[in-house]
């Protein structure tokens, strides 16, 4: 699984005040080159310093040492187009685990209070500057709760997309999981994964 190149502005974060009674401060990292995995991770942790490109590159090299044959090869593979193994290993360095969601299961059994956030891999339109091409590639996005509501923190969005409460979130997840080539990861603390307390049907 990989992410879609994006020729937009450089990655940047914004503290956005959204129109609510008590506007939450939301960290939303924007897309730069092929670094959507990095942006999704930082958006999950709501921290611009949670991970860097160098951190993910070190993890990638550790997981795939035999792929780093020459400096040219290293440059070609080190473009930030990271797969699920890098994301899972990165989360483990922070004491978290990525639980792969079986799409045959009902999202209604997810124990949302025990899940810090969600990372989704889904098809996204391929763009070149302002032009949208008739092609799609896989893209990493983050969804998480901030200030009592859930937001889509896709790094390609201009600002966080409000989803709503728990019922709206489940509808959002169901909608995307019905599509082709969509995968869902639950980001949970290690102890939650160990006891499988991310689910209510155990």
UniProtKB/Swiss-Prot annotation:
<feature type="modified residue" description="Phosphoserine">
    <location>
        <position position="15"/>
    </location>
</feature>
<feature type="active site" description="Nucleophile">
    <location>
        <position position="36"/>
    </location>
</feature>
<keyword id="KW-0597">Phosphoprotein</keyword>
<keyword id="KW-0472">Membrane</keyword>
<dbReference type="GO" id="GO:0004843">
    <property type="term" value="F:cysteine-type deubiquitinase activity"/>
</dbReference>
<dbReference type="Pfam" id="PF02099">
    <property type="entry name" value="Josephin"/>
</dbReference>
<keyword id="KW-0963">Cytoplasm</keyword>
<dbReference type="GO" id="GO:0006508">
    <property type="term" value="P:proteolysis"/>
</dbReference>
<comment type="subunit">
    <text>Interacts with beta-actin/ACTB.</text>
</comment>
<dbReference type="GO" id="GO:0005829">
    <property type="term" value="C:cytosol"/>
</dbReference>
<comment type="function">
    <text>Deubiquitinates monoubiquitinated probes (in vitro). When ubiquitinated, cleaves 'Lys-63'-linked and 'Lys-48'-linked poly-ubiquitin chains (in vitro), hence may act as a deubiquitinating enzyme. May increase macropinocytosis and suppress clathrin- and caveolae-mediated endocytosis. May enhance membrane dynamics and cell motility independently of its catalytic activity.</text>
</comment>
<dbReference type="GO" id="GO:0006897">
    <property type="term" value="P:endocytosis"/>
</dbReference>
<dbReference type="GO" id="GO:0016579">
    <property type="term" value="P:protein deubiquitination"/>
</dbReference>
<dbReference type="GO" id="GO:0005886">
    <property type="term" value="C:plasma membrane"/>
</dbReference>
<keyword id="KW-0832">Ubl conjugation</keyword>
<dbReference type="GO" id="GO:0016020">
    <property type="term" value="C:membrane"/>
</dbReference>
<feature type="active site" description="Proton acceptor">
    <location>
        <position position="139"/>
    </location>
</feature>
<dbReference type="InterPro" id="IPR040053">
    <property type="entry name" value="JOSD1/2"/>
</dbReference>
<dbReference type="InterPro" id="IPR006155">
    <property type="entry name" value="Josephin"/>
</dbReference>
<keyword id="KW-0833">Ubl conjugation pathway</keyword>
<dbReference type="GO" id="GO:0061024">
    <property type="term" value="P:membrane organization"/>
</dbReference>
<dbReference type="GO" id="GO:0048870">
    <property type="term" value="P:cell motility"/>
</dbReference>
<dbReference type="GO" id="GO:0044091">
    <property type="term" value="P:membrane biogenesis"/>
</dbReference>
<keyword id="KW-0378">Hydrolase</keyword>
<keyword id="KW-0645">Protease</keyword>
<protein>
    <recommendedName>
        <fullName>Josephin-1</fullName>
        <ecNumber>3.4.19.12</ecNumber>
    </recommendedName>
</protein>
<feature type="domain" description="Josephin">
    <location>
        <begin position="23"/>
        <end position="202"/>
    </location>
</feature>
<keyword id="KW-1003">Cell membrane</keyword>
